[in-house]
From Swiss-Prot:
Its EC number is 1.14.-.-. The gene is cyp165A3. This is Cytochrome P450 165A3. GO terms for biological process: vancomycin biosynthetic process. Belongs to the cytochrome P450 family. It comes from Amycolatopsis orientalis (Nocardia orientalis).
């Protein structure tokens, strides 16, 4: 990770609690400059920088003068994981992303929407039948996220619960040994999915890639793409749904707008994405040549990390930085920017646009079951671990 090596030494670039960036990161945002940091992720003691401004972050992520690949391939133990799109540079990145993007067509998204609606309805039916109070993280966010993403990718329903469990354990288990064991199970299963898809491609995302580009994508790349897309998508969607439900009950006046005005859904989605920023920062980019970012000259070989959390708040500084779905044009970089922007964004947004309004209409009096009890959060990026709601 990056540690400060100048007067800002000791500053944490993670949020401290809930959705607040914390005073140290806010101070960097107020200064409006790139901060020098020391990189331990690459050899030779590279100079590292932290970008906290919205425009600076977009400039870094959208520039072809930075490399994602050098960070992984340029370390003593580093190597590129086949199929992991975030580790590639053009032209390899262009080739692989084009193949995967062919499965995210507008038509495929449109045809898949009824399945999302069915999953959401079944989940809400189950919650309503149980009666409150209900923990909406394991009963609402994770079931919808897991089922939708797995259905889209072609994971059989009978395998989805176990796959979700091992994927979550591979990231959240406090024991390193258990994390590794869960990760191995996850990779083994995804390898089986890739092999089966190669033999018999179905009517799903992986099947579409094999049918259209089977001769151009290697077995290792297919496995990597499968593991990468599943790993990146499930967590993101679950985080958005958990946080979206929490923000609904914390802001009843804006909950009412969402419930009564269908046209407010896109604004709600954009503001949740901006305010939540589930992935707080990017992996570092390595400068391929000297380049000026804002007022700062970044030299060839320097590493730049972009704080998505700070960049999303930079345009709306405190005290105006509050959750507000009526905000004008709440632009954000939560899904990244440039050639590495999130490929699954249309699917994630479709799930959110379907699930959150359905939740609001099914339970118009949704509220915290224990208003005085603090919401349980995990370690950074502070995922909502439990959200007990009633209606």
């Amino acid at each position: 990770m990056f540690e400060e090596k100048n007067a800002l030494r000791g500053t944490e670039i993670h949020r401290r609690e809930r959705f607040d960036p914390g005073p140290e990161l806010r101070a960097l945002m107020a200064e409006g400059r790139m901060s020098v940091m020391e990189s331990e992720e690459s050899p030779g003691g590279r100079t590292g920088w932290l970008a906290t401004g919205y425009e600076e972050t977009r400039q870094v992520l959208g520039s072809d003068k930075f490399s994602a690949k050098l960070l992984f391939g340029g370390t003593a133990a580093g190597r590129i994981w086949p199929g992991f799109l975030n580790q590639y540079d053009p032209p390899e990145h262009t080739r692989l992303r084009r193949m995967v993007a062919s499965a995210f067509t507008v038509r495929r998204m449109r045809d898949f929407r009824p399945r999302i609606e069915a999953v959401v309805k079944a989940t809400l039916d189950d919650i309503e039948a149980t009666g409150g109070p209900v923990d909406f993280v394991p009963r609402f966010a994770w079931p919808i996220a897991t089922t939708v993403i797995c259905d889209f990718l072609g994971i059989p329903r009978d395998d989805q619960a176990e796959l979700s469990r091992v994927l979550h354990a591979s990231r959240s288990e406090r024991s390193g040994k258990r994390r590794v064991a869960a990760g191995n199970k996850y990779w083994t299963y995804m390898g089986q999915v890739a092999a089966k898809t190669r033999r018999d491609p179905g009517d799903d995302m992986f099947g579409a890639v094999v049918r259209e580009h089977g001769d151009d994508i290697t077995d290792a790349e297919l496995l990597g793409v499968a593991a990468f897309v599943m790993g990146a998508s499930g967590d993101q969607v679950a985080r958005f749904l958990s946080a979206g439900a929490w923000l609904m009950v914390e802001h009843p006046e804006q909950f009412a707008v969402l419930r009564d005005d269908p046209d407010s859904v896109p604004d709600w989605l954009n503001e949740v994405a901006r305010y939540l920023t589930s992935d707080e920062k990017t992996t570092p980019r390595i400068a391929l040549e000297d380049v000026r970012i804002g007022d700062q000259l970044v030299k060839k070989g320097d590493a730049v990390t972009c704080s998505l959390l700070a960049s999303n708040r930079h345009r709306f500084p405190d005290p105006e930085d509050r959750f507000d779905i009526t905000r004008e044009k709440p632009s954000h970089v939560t899904f990244g920017h440039g050639i590495h922007h999130c490929l699954g964004r249309p699917l994630a947004e479709m799930v959110f646009r379907t699930a959150i309004p359905a939740l609001a209409h099914r339970f118009p009096t949704l509220r915290l079951a224990e208003p005085d009890r603090e919401i349980k959060l995990g370690p950074p990026p502070f995922d909502v671990e439990a959200l007990l709601l009633d209606w």
